[in-house]
Amino acid sequence: AENKKNVLELLDNVWEPATNRAQEEIDEIQNLIQKEGNNFKLKPWDWWYYSEKVRKSKFDYSEEDMRPYLSLENIQKAAFTTAERLFDIKFKAMKKFPKYHEEIKAYKVLDNNNKIVGIFLTDYFARPSKQGGAWMTSYQDQSKNKGIKHPIVINVCNFPKPTKDKPTLLSFEQAITLFHEFGHGLHGLLSNVTYPSLSGTSVPRDYVEFPSQMMENWIRSPKVLKEFALHYETGKKIPQDLLKKYEKCQKFNQGFATTEYLAASYLDLAWHSNNRKIIDINKFEQKLFKSLKKPNEIDSRYGSTYFNHIFSGGYSSSYYSYMWSEVLDSSAFEVFEKKGLFHKLSLIHISEPTRLRR
């Protein structure tokens, strides 16, 4: 992005359309609240409950409708198959590998000549002592300096464990999370550099979310869902009418989602442009959001005291990079939409800036 001016230009260009759309969504929810005989004003903590009611009434669709078709096993298979088709690699389960918990699974990643590419680990399930959220970590970065080192990376999530009666069934948002973190994992696994300091996700922040957000497109694709979204009991493919409902509401709640994200991006920049040593956090946030004319019904995705990304998570003054990468991802994925979902030559559009092997 080069400078703050360019970042603000991107955020400002999106802010007004996003908040305009968010206001329409607010009005829809407020109308529903009143229609149900209530007279209170919508608050941020009411949003998800009532927005789901609006979605159900407008599209006859709920994310819970998808869950029986999104078993963890099948969604992971979808991710692996997508990578295999795009990058000519394969994932082989390993029975023995040092690990810090018994739930971790290890996979040897091989190229089409059966040569080792790296090791991919998964730690998918929630447990009492585990940090919340989802992320990718590299235990060994790929490099060629002083001998070849193959990458060892892990995807960590907090999905519910299977029960005696049911496998782990994901919400669609959780399926997207799996693909997102898998994109980060591929960024580390397919790195092709000499020096470890440039390996994997060690790219400019403008690009670091590019491979992860790019991967999300495949799980959103009806073609992939038709192949891998299978009912956990019957094995039947996801019904066409359910897919159509899903496609119709793809942009539902986008005003809200974009507004809360942008508010957090502005907050990040405000903190890292501030020179004062002592500050009242609440007043600082209130002043910023008032200047932006942020709708009171929508909170920032993260408040200052819970904004791990920008204070200890490596995104200091660069939380904007999610949107920056989204712009890149949108342009790059257009090529796949035109030439085919698994068109290998289209990979040139994502390989160069992210230093991936081709």
What are these regions, as identified by a protein language model?
Residues 1-158, 217-266, 270, 281-284, ...:
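Active-site-proximal, well-structured secondary-structure segments within enzyme catalytic domains
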Residues 167-170, 188-214:
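Post-HEXXH active-site segment of zinc metalloproteases
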Residues 88-94, 187, 193-198, 222-228, ...:
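Acidic/polar loop patches that form or flank catalytic/metal-binding clefts of enzymes
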Residues 348-358:
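Single conserved hydrophobic/aromatic residue that forms the stacking wall/gate
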Residues 66, 72-75, 243-336, 344-347:
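Pan-zinc metallopeptidase signature
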Residues 160-178:
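Short pre-active-site segment immediately N-terminal to the catalytic Zn-binding motif
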Residues 173-188, 212:
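Active-site recognition of the HExxH zinc-binding catalytic motif
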Residues 83, 182, 212, 267, ...:
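Divalent metal-coordination and catalytic microenvironments
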